[in-house]
């Protein structure tokens, strides 16, 4: 079983560090090298690999410096995105070996066209596609692509731990409660999130099982979610409901 640690960066990013028992590690989406280097030094760890989900600067900004400091590391990332430091470009359906665990690469377009995720050892590293109680903005792809990517994640086991790249949970829960004000699970979760953030603790990882109860973007067939946007749409199919929710969240 791999250990996962969070390294905060910028205002709300998480760089996830994956560690084995031999003090070897990998990091996911290092937008800045400085906090990673400090953590490696403090905990006497050996960096072996970098995993990248997409090309946005707050996810890759530290990669060049990490490669400079550790020239032998593997840099794994989406083959379809402009990331010059990649040594191992991957795409949907590929597999990678990481510290004797096998991770599957999932194509998750929507936020960006080539966005990918990594799932293995009961853990999902999904970048800016799925957040707790929310989902990423659709920048390069289409609403249909993002909706399809989220549905792909729903097929994973409910106990899968979800490691998103940002601490957006409190704001997402506020929106989710606007969508479903009578969702008792959301009220319970809001209190838990408030307690964790008051202690400066991360709200992640979450689980897919929990997200099915609290994330409106995964609940587009629930009557309470449909009612929240029904007056804004002409049809009530799940993609239309998702699109209306995402557009609402953009302005929330």
From Swiss-Prot:
Catalytically driven reaction(s): an S-(2-hydroxyacyl)glutathione + H2O = a 2-hydroxy carboxylate + glutathione + H(+)
Entry keyword set: Hydrolase, Metal-binding, Zinc
Binding annotation for Zn(2+) 1: 54, 56, 111, 128
GO biological process, one term: methylglyoxal catabolic process to D-lactate via S-lactoyl-glutathione
Listed CDD domains: hydroxyacylglutathione_hydrolase_MBL-fold
Obligatory cofactor(s): Zn(2+)
EC annotation from Swiss-Prot or TrEMBL: 3.1.2.6
Residues binding Zn(2+) 2: 58-59, 128, 166
InterPro entries: Clx_II_MBL, Glyoxalase_II_hydrolase, HAGH_C, Hydroxyacylglutathione_Hdrlase, Metallo-B-lactamas, RibonucZ/Hydroxyglut_hydro
PANTHER family: HYDROXYACYLGLUTATHIONE HYDROLASE (PTHR43705), HYDROXYACYLGLUTATHIONE HYDROLASE GLOB (PTHR43705:SF1)
Function per UniProt: Thiolesterase that catalyzes the hydrolysis of S-D-lactoyl-glutathione to form glutathione and D-lactic acid.
Subunit relationships: Monomer.
Membership in a protein family: Belongs to the metallo-beta-lactamase superfamily. Glyoxalase II family.
Protein name: Hydroxyacylglutathione hydrolase
Species this chain originates from: Vibrio cholerae serotype O1 (strain ATCC 39315 / El Tor Inaba N16961)
